């Protein structure tokens, strides 16, 4: 039996040649929806590439974006001209492409067979859009599951999104009806230390006190370091801001990883890459290969536990700080996913921020499977 999902990907300095190679890999077969991810070298040719894949496949509905890196089954393309394409033979009533120019189905509306028309969405967003976090939360409120998966476009220059046409700015993607069986999980790139702390005094992005103690003293104590040791360890130390009232997939705390941006030894202050709230609970985290690999496998097996049979295809949206930068070898992260999830069609990209549920994350990977 032929799979309803087909995959093609290629790297070549010429956009047309790369697209032709990827299309040839798809082989014969129909489809109603396509995903296309390109690296930034091909941004100037995005419209031509979209026109070409529409003509060659006969598929009108396309979504995707640009990434400094993109991925396919067992492979990642980083800082090289490349394209990854996946087509999906889904019934036409099961999905709806949206953008600033095309509205998604109304929340509460139904398909002809009675399914929720707006159940779950794969989304791509422009990182330069003002109030992007509020926009993501608003979009999550427009699907009945409350779940989104995707990421912010990443490029050193201009970014583009595909949503039946080439668009820029805002948020776009595809909304699926509840007829489409989808599962999604998130993996963190950091391991939290065991202690939780309450932010008892903060000013903008500065942690002044934790548990009514100087923030820097608490951090050094948790890490088991003195100031000299911290200078070496700071690069791999992060802050996890726990999200009140929410639980991560697989149990445990749902937390947002933020950078440690500075310390003030004299005043015992810690600066972070976010503006926390007074009374918010946080923890310090360490980033290393072992914890990243372990949590990636945890995510995969959480997903597999929910599956009655092997998944048909997958999408992977990961932080640009992951991939080769975190796993030490190009393609190592994607090979791990293939090894443990199966040799199935997979496409995605390395994002400037990852979208899961109704939030924007960092240093994470969001894996979505079609059941």
Named regions from a protein language model:
Residues 1-54, 60-61, 65-314, 319-327, ...:
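Small-residue-enriched flexible segments
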């Amino acid at each position: 039996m032929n799979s309803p999902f087909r995959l093609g990907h290629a790297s070549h300095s010429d956009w047309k040649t790369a697209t032709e190679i990827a299309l040839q890999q798809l082989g014969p077969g129909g489809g109603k929806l396509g995903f296309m991810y390109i690296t930034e070298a091909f941004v100037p040719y995005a419209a031509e590439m979209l026109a070409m894949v529409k003509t060659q496949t006969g598929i009108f509905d396309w979504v995707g974006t640009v990434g400094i890196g993109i991925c396919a089954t067992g492979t990642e393309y980083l800082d090289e001209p490349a394209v990854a394409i996946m087509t999906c033979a889904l019934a036409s009533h099961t999905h709806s492409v949206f953008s600033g120019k095309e509205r998604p189905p109304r929340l509460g509306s139904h398909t002809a067979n009675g399914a929720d028309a707006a159940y779950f969405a794969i989304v791509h967003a422009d990182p330069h859009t003002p109030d992007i976090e509020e926009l993501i939360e608003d979009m999550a409120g427009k699907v009945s599951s409350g779940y989104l998966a995707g990421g912010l476009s990443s490029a050193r220059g201009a970014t583009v999104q595909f949503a039946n046409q080439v668009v820029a700015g805002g948020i776009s993607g595809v909304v699926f009806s509840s007829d489409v069986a989808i599962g999604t999980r998130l993996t963190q790139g950091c391991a939290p230390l065991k202690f939780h702390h309450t932010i008892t005094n903060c000013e903008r992005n500065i942690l002044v006190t934790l548990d009514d103690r100087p923030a820097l003293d608490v951090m050094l104590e948790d890490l088991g370091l003195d100031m000299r040791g911290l200078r070496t360890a700071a690069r791999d130390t992060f802050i996890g801001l726990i999200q009140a009232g929410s639980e991560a997939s697989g149990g445990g705390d749902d937390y947002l990883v933020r950078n440690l941006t500075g310390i003030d030894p004299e005043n015992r202050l810690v600066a972070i890459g976010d503006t926390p709230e007074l009374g918010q609970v946080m923890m310090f985290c360490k980033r290393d290969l072992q914890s990243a690999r372990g949590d990636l496998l945890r995510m995969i097996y959480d997903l597999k536990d929910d599956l009655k049979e092997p998944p048909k295809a997958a999408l992977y949206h990961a932080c640009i700080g992951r991939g080769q930068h975190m796993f030490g070898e190009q393609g190592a992260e994607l090979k791990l996913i293939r090894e443990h999830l199966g040799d199935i069609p997979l496409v995605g990209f390395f994002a400037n921020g990852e979208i899961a549920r109704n939030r924007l994350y960092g240093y994470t990977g969001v894996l979505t499977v079609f059941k």
